[in-house]
Amino acid sequence: GPNRSKTPLQPDTIMIYNGKVYVLDAKLYRYGYSGNPNHLPNGPDINKQITYGEYIERTKGVPSENLYNAFIMPFNREDNTFFEMGADGNPISRITDNIGNIGEAVGDWKPNPKNYERVQGIVIDTRFLMYNYIGMPDQQKRQLAEAIEKVETRAPVPRPAT
């Protein structure tokens, strides 16, 4: 067959803020509007995000405690059924902000996952995104970073059932 060149790993967006690196996958995952689990990022998406983190840690020397992963999903802040998740993994309050953390995706093949191996699910209000398309002010970068860093307060990932 014809020769094909392999494309290198290229994450959607990398945000560097306060000395930390955030690998962001921002596609139109419909979960932010539908709430349907079938509209969440799937296994290959999760694997790819974890691979990006491994690559950055290994080749760029970024310490794992300063490296995070997140799926960014659009949602409607004014009309949503999402709840912020507490450190124990239980819902605590409805998301009323422009940015919220709705959970995480992990690979069950990773015992004791590093922060970047626990891919955070972040919703961002679509109207807010449109108004901040050109550049995100530091206040919003801080808000996004804080939402992603909630991984540090979550309980350990339970072992997979066998």
What is the predicted function of each stretch?
Residues 1-162:
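Catalytic core segments in nucleotide and nucleic-acid processing enzymes
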